[in-house]
Amino acid sequence: MAIAIVILQNDPARAERLVASMKSVSATVRTVQSIAELEKLASRLPIQVGVLDLDLVTLQEIAGLRRQFGIEIVCTHHAPDDAMWTAALRAGALDCCFVDDAPGICRAIQQSMAA
């Protein structure tokens, strides 16, 4: 089954690097500039996975995206720690990865889709 991945990152250049990396997981990868844009897109198209920067989204927004749209979330941050990782997982995220850890992000997505 083809999956659609949406990337919301604080740095547009980083977002484009993640798009290139995510192409190994899915041919359908898009970027958005805000949580509002992501919600609008998800209301029109089936989005299976969001790769979301914790500098731009709250844990409550992550929980809301999971509840409202069923989107699997991989959080990213420039310096995630154990407390942030635990909080992200409690909010429903699959994982919380360093923002530049494309292999880890891809692995989290692939493990979720295989389950």
Identify the meaning behind each predicted range:
Residues 33-49, 56:
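Acidic, metal-coordinating helix/loop segments flanking the phosphotransfer/catalytic sites
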Residues 50, 73, 96-97:
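Two-component signal transduction core modules
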Residues 43-45, 65-71, 91:
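Conserved phosphotransfer cores of two-component systems
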Residues 26-34:
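Short hydrophobic/Thr-rich beta-strand motif most characteristic of the beta2 strand and flanking loop
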Residues 105-115:
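Receiver (REC) domain switch/output surface
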Residues 2-12, 18-22, 50-51:
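Conserved acidic segment of CheY-like receiver
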Residues 15, 48-69, 80-84:
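Conserved phosphotransfer microenvironments
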Residues 77-97:
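Alpha4 helix (beta4-alpha4-beta5 surface) of REC/receiver domains from two-component response regulators
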